[in-house]
Amino acid sequence: GKELIAEKVKTLVMMAGCFDGSNPSEYNVWKDIPAAQKIVAQWPTDLVFAPFELGVQVCYPATSIENDFAWAEDHPVVEAYKAYLPMPYDRPCWDPAALVYAVEGDKWFGVSDPGKISISDGGTTTFEVCENGRHRYLTVTPEQAAALTDHIVEIVTRQL
């Protein structure tokens, strides 16, 4: 239970929430508001949100989908993109950005001050700075977004 998490897990990174002041109920919160509320209220270690507004600033480029996977016939990434929407389109990197933070830390990001995240019964997320808070959320400047996009492309297109 919580004791094992507290002993073994340093930080939980979640792609969830929105902290830009527009107050939407972000999809990953909205799909199960009570579960999201329980996580932010009871998680025993640090919690970092990679919010909606971060992902839309870091978009995986259609040019990479169209050009960087030619080495494999019917590459599953290319086929998934084609099945989802007509090409070409850039796609927000919500989950890849959260994964990069979870694995590599804050090299590519800004990180909020410590605080407390709350989730309303309608699914909106709010953040209040507090000195002993265990919650944070990620941000990117335009320069960081461009560098992170390039980094994600480099990771995704790497041939093993």
Residue ranges, per PLM feature:
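N-terminal acidic, glycine/proline-rich low-complexity segments
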Residues: 1-160
